[in-house]
Amino acid sequence: SKENIIAYINGEIEDVIIDEKIAMGTQDTEVARAWIDAALAAKPEYLALDSETNGLYPRNGHMIGISMSYTGKDGIYIDTDCFDEDIEEKLGRLFKNTKVIFHNAKFDMAFFEYHFGFEFPDFEDTMLLHYLIDENPGGHGLKELSLKFTPYGDYEKPMYDWIDQYKRSNGLNQESFQWDMIPFDIMKTYAAMDAVCTYLLYEKFVKIKQNPKLKWVYDHILIPGCRFLMDAQDNGVPFDRMRLLVSQGLMQDDIDAAINQLYEVEAVREFEKAQGKDFNPNSTVQLRSLLFDYIGLQPTGKKTGTGANSTDAEVLQQLGEEHDVPKFILNIRQKSKIKNTYLDKIIPQLDRDSRLRTNFNLHGTTSGRLSSSGKLNMQQLPRDNPIVK
C-alpha cells in the first residue's frame, strides 16, 4: 500500500531478515526424511512446491533440488543427491494426497513427472491465478509478484549477485552458465524462499476464485489447459530429419545461386573494382554505399535508429522498382532468414525421436490466445514458402 511504501522510505519498517528459521536447506538424507515425515503427519491442506534444474526441458536437463513449504512461514530446499527410494516413495505419497501449489506448474510438473514419475492429481498455479486478474504479458514471474505481494521481495538478489561475479571471474556469458554451477549454500536460501513465496501468493490469489466467472475460467480452461499443453510439449512436434537436411541443402543452393546472380550485375562488379574488395551483401554500410552513392538511387526518407538511410525490406522492395540490385538483395535476405531461423535452428535441437520440444503458453497474450516460445516459436513458421512446407 501507499502507506507501507512511505513508512518503508521513512525507515519505519525494518527489512525482513531471511535466516535458517525461514529458509533452510539440506543435503542430509535423514534431515530430508524427517521433514517429509513431518509434512505427511501434518496432513496440510496444501503444499507449495518448486524445482531447481540445470535445463529448461526435462530431456535436456536434470533436477538439482526441490523446495517445499506447507505453512508459508518457512520452507526447505533439499538437494536431490540425498534422495533414496524411501524418500521418493514418501514424496510421491505426499504429492498424490495433497493439493500442490506451483508457480508455473507446466514447467515443474514436467520435470517431476519425467525424472521421478510423481503424480499431481490436485494442483494449482499461482502464475495462472495472477493471469486471471492481469492478462498483460510479462509481470507474472515469481520474483516480480513476491516483491509486490509478500514481505520477502528481492530475496533472490544475493544469489544473482554471486552469479554475476562468478560469470565475470570465469569469463562466462549467459548461455554458457549452468544452474548447477551455483554452490548449495548459495542456492538453498533462494530456492527455499521460492516455495515460501509461492505459498504466500496462493493465500492471496486464491480469493480470486470467489468470483464464479473467474473460477470457471480457471477450473475449466486454465488448469486443464496447463495439463494439456504439458502433455503436448512432452509429445513434441514431429519433423522428418532427412527431409529437413535435404531442404537445408536446397535452400543453401538457392542462396548461392541468388548471390551469384547478384555478383553478375555490372554495377556490383564495378563497385567491387572501385572499392578494391568483394561486396558483402550482409554489410548495410556497403549496401548503402552501393545503392545510394554508386548506383545513385534516391533514398526513400526512411531512417534507422541512428539516423542512417534504411535498407530494410520495405525500402528494398520500393527501390527494386527502379533497379535489380535491391530485388536481388531482398531475395537473398528472405532465403537466408528462412534457412538461418528455421532449418539451421530446428535440426540440431531435434531429440532422438526426431521431435522438437518447445513451449506453448497460456499466459503470454492479452487476447487469451496461445503463444509459443523456447527452442522454436511454432507460430512464426512461414506457411507459404515451398521449402518450409
Q: Which residue ranges define each predicted feature?
A:
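Conserved "right-hand" nucleotidyltransferase catalytic core of DNA-directed polymerases
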Residues: 1-80, 137, 148-150, 158-386
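Short, basic/hydrophobic alpha-helical segments
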Residues: 34-39, 84-98
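Acidic beta-strand-to-loop metal/phosphate-binding motif
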Residues: 48, 98-105
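Short, glycine/acidic-enriched loop or turn micro-motifs at the edges of active sites
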Residues: 53-55, 106-107, 128
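Conserved beta-strand scaffold positions in the cores of enzyme catalytic domains, especially
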Residues: 75-77, 100, 121-125
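Short active-site oxyanion
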Residues: 95-100, 276-278
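Phosphate- and divalent-cation-binding pockets in alpha/beta enzyme and binding domains
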Residues: 108-114, 290
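Conserved beta-strand -> loop -> alpha-helix junction used to position metal-binding or nucleic-acid-contacting
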Residues: 118-135, 141-147
